[in-house]
């Protein structure tokens, strides 16, 4: 089996500070890979490079055996690399559905969607409900409730569901259990297992 994601000799400096020094990794389909190290070891920088938020000074990234380079997280997402950031990058004042489709809204068919850009809220809600159900997040009763009303573990679940909903090949999670209790941490680890079982 060939690795889905390969990083070779990735380096990044900020002035004289070396944030990442010749980092290498191989990730295979369905593999869960943990990156561990001391504070300041470059873990977050590596994640930011792999998801397109930071451009490395040197090195290369291969996705499905092809060399890729990203100038933004949007480019990485387009190629199938999704990220669940430590802060989750959710908007608390928006609903679960709105957060899952933020920046990727489904428009209505025909004139209303094409020219007036009306959103297909029903299709988005159905898809959000389906994704949350696939990940076993049935404790969320109302798909339209605001994210700010959810527990930490439920918010993490929404972020994971969003990351796995759009043709994803790789999901990168930055400290997925940070600031969560034992029960919520266990549920997040179960979510990771469920994502892995889907071959992501």
Spell out what each predicted region is:
Residues 1-200:
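Glycine-rich phosphate-binding loops of nucleotide-dependent enzymes
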């Amino acid at each position: 089996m060939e690795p889905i994601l390969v990083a070779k000799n990735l380096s990044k400096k900020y002035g004289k500070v070396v944030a990442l020094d010749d980092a290498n990794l191989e990730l295979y389909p369905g593999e869960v890979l943990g990156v561990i190290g001391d504070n300041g070891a470059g873990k977050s920088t590596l994640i930011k490079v792999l998801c397109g938020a930071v451009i490395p000074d040197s090195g290369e990234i291969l996705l499905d055996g092809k060399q890729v380079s990203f100038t933004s997280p949007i480019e990485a997402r387009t190629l199938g690399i999704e990220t669940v950031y430590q802060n989750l990058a959710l908007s608390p004042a928006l609903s679960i559905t709105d957060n899952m489709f933020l920046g990727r809204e489904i428009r209505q068919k025909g004139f209303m969607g094409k020219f007036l850009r009306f959103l297909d809220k029903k299709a988005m809600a159905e898809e959000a409900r389906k994704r949350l159900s696939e990940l076993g997040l049935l404790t969320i009763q109302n798909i339209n409730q605001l994210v700010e009303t959810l527990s930490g573990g439920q918010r993490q679940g929404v972020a994971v569901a969003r990351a796995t909903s759009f043709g994803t090949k790789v999901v990168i999670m930055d400290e997925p259990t940070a600031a969560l209790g034992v029960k919520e941490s266990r549920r997040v680890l179960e979510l990771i297992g469920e994502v892995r079982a889907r071959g992501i």
